[in-house]
Amino acid sequence: MNNRRVLVLGSGVTGKSAAEFLRNRGDYVIGVDGSAEALHSCHFFCERYLDSAEEFPEDIDLCVRSPGIKTSHPFVVEAKHRGIPIVTDIQLAFQDPEFHRYPSLGVTGSAGKTTTVLFLVHLLRSVGMSACAMGNIGFPILQAMYQKGIRVVEISSFQLAEQEIEIPVLSAAAILNISENHLDYHYTLQAYTEAKSHIAKCLQSPESLWVGDGVSFGKSYLEATREINLVLDKGSALKPLYLHDRNNYCAGYALANEVTKIPLESFLQAVLTFDKPPHRIEYLGEKDGVRYINDSKATTMSSVEKALIAVKENIIVILGGRNKGSNFASLIPVLTQTVKHVVAMGECRTEIAQALSSSNLPLTQAQDLQEAVHVAQSIAQPGDVILLSPGCASFDQFRSFEERGDCFKQLVGEMEALKI
């Protein structure tokens, strides 16, 4: 397994973790990236190539593709042409004995992955079990797998795309839902769905795959936890819960029960004590009768729709950013039922305006988030809700959806007398 010549595509957080992992196992690691600065910031590379180079390194035994590197990348295409095995950090970890020391659970889907993973870790710990989150959640799996406890792995479609090998390591997994997403990467919904389905290749048993909306195979966690979901709904006085939150918690409950028996009372207590991560329909407060909600994590049409349904009415919604290949016209039915004004911001503001032109909804374009908030505030009246739910990536103005959400909070927080 060692002394191989391994090509690592991408020198971001994941690429660096892969390079470190491989070097520690005696491999000769060659890095490829579009940035010379990024390449030289990783001292685990033995050689470095800019991805604009026409020359493909010789005698490569393995290619490791970082999630941000498309499967259409010239180096990926050339590796396929030469018959070189291509894996991601997920497959590297799943094949390593270190990962196998504890049971593992996998979570993928179009929306709700991070919330489900964090809740699952919280739930397992609440009943006295060791558990740790890793993967696409921000803790690279090749570094985090050295922790003790049940591995709860968030897995993106980028990490599963074109997986060919079967690695039966996961005790159970969930595809929470599938809706139109990342079409700028996968190009078609079929390819995106196929990528998500590859998580089944990582299961010890096909009977341990739980699925939600938009998935036609596997066991429905929504059906299996229907009565528990109703309990959560009726118990909302104890803690207000949106439907998608209840679904995420029920998915976590189904997965947790694959590795240990969770009493219903323990599950309900875990729901009560769980702090949902920020930027997900996050209530910020009220000023002059206008409520403010930060849903910066919403980068898909499905997520925006869920937010609009949750908030219900009198909404001034801020949409926009960098489109990921979505069709905003698909939002017209729910927008017309819930929204009084649309503020379209950022790189794709004109595209949004054109897509929604047949709806006759009032719409104002804004160059950036700061202007969008100003426009929304100038329109809002007591009883209205200003909802940031962009339906787009943030990269036209920000480095991440977190930075975008924090900027929104700062803009809102600059108002005096905001009531939380």
From Swiss-Prot:
ATP binds at G109, S110, A111, G112, K113, T114, T115. It catalyses: UDP-N-acetyl-alpha-D-muramoyl-L-alanine + D-glutamate + ATP = UDP-N-acetyl-alpha-D-muramoyl-L-alanyl-D-glutamate + ADP + phosphate + H(+). InterPro entries: Mur-like_cat_sf, Mur_ligase_C, Mur_ligase_C_dom_sf, Mur_ligase_cen, MurD. Its main location: cytoplasm. Pathway: Cell wall biogenesis; peptidoglycan biosynthesis. Coiled coil: none annotated. The keyword Secreted does not apply. One of its GO terms (biological process) is cell wall organization. Pfam families: Mur_ligase_C, Mur_ligase_M, MurD-like_N. It is found in: Cytoplasm. It comes from the Bacteria. GO terms for molecular function: ATP binding; UDP-N-acetylmuramoylalanine-D-glutamate ligase activity. Its EC number is 6.3.2.9. Keywords: ATP-binding, Cell cycle, Cell division, Cell shape, Cell wall biogenesis/degradation, Cytoplasm, Ligase, Nucleotide-binding, Peptidoglycan synthesis. Belongs to the MurCDEF family. Cell wall formation. Catalyzes the addition of glutamate to the nucleotide precursor UDP-N-acetylmuramoyl-L-alanine (UMA). This is UDP-N-acetylmuramoylalanine--D-glutamate ligase. The gene is murD.
